[in-house]
UniProtKB/Swiss-Prot annotation:
Keyword rRNA-binding belongs to the record: no
Record's function text: Effector protein that participates in the suppression of macrophage apoptosis by blocking the extrinsic pathway. Interferes with caspase-8 activation and binds to the host E3 ubiquitin-protein ligase RNF213, whose fusion partners have anti-apoptotic function.
Naturally occurring in which organism (per UniProt): Mycobacterium tuberculosis (strain ATCC 25618 / H37Rv)
Signal found in the keyword field: yes
Signal peptide range: 1-33
Keywords assigned by UniProt, alphabetized: Host cytoplasm, Secreted, Signal, Virulence
UniProt-listed InterPro entries: Rv3655c/TadE
GO cellular component, one term: cytosol
Name of the protein in question: Apoptosis inhibitor Rv3655c
Biological process, per Gene Ontology: symbiont-mediated suppression of host apoptosis
Length: 125
């Protein structure tokens, strides 16, 4: 009886450790994706920014790129399958370069918003 309880506890601890390592890995990927998206969008290349963020971010991540004054803000949010109550997100901010077209990102319609250049660009990966 005690051995069964010990084995079940050990398995639970191992699953939680695996979930923690997976969450940290997803966080690093979200940070990298947000950083690259903000950097590219600040140069005025919003489409490349979302494409690069898609390739770096975890699967099924939500990528948002929008202008906030003189800054370009990129946010990447992913959902952990092993920790269902945990959403992992990262945000990167970059100053828009002078003369860039980052002031008005091109419309990229998605399932969350209608195509409107005044709203943030939201891309579901």
């Amino acid at each position: 009886m005690e051995a069964a309880l010990a084995i079940a506890t050990l398995v639970l601890v191992l699953v939680l450790c695996l979930a923690g390592v997976t969450a940290v890995s997803m966080q690093v990927r979200c940070i990298d994706a947000a950083r690259e998206a903000a950097r590219l969008a600040a140069r005025g290349d919003v489409r490349s920014a979302t494409d690069v963020a898609r390739s770096i971010a975890p699967r099924a991540a939500l990528v948002q790129v929008h202008r906030d004054g003189e800054f370009v803000v990129a946010t990447v949010t992913a959902h952990s399958n092993l920790l269902p109550t945990l959403d992992i997100a990262a945000r990167a901010i970059s100053v828009a370069e002078p003369g860039s077209t980052a002031a008005r990102p091109p419309c990229l319609p998605s399932r969350w918003s209608r195509c409107c250049c005044a709203s943030p660009v939201r891309v579901h990966i």
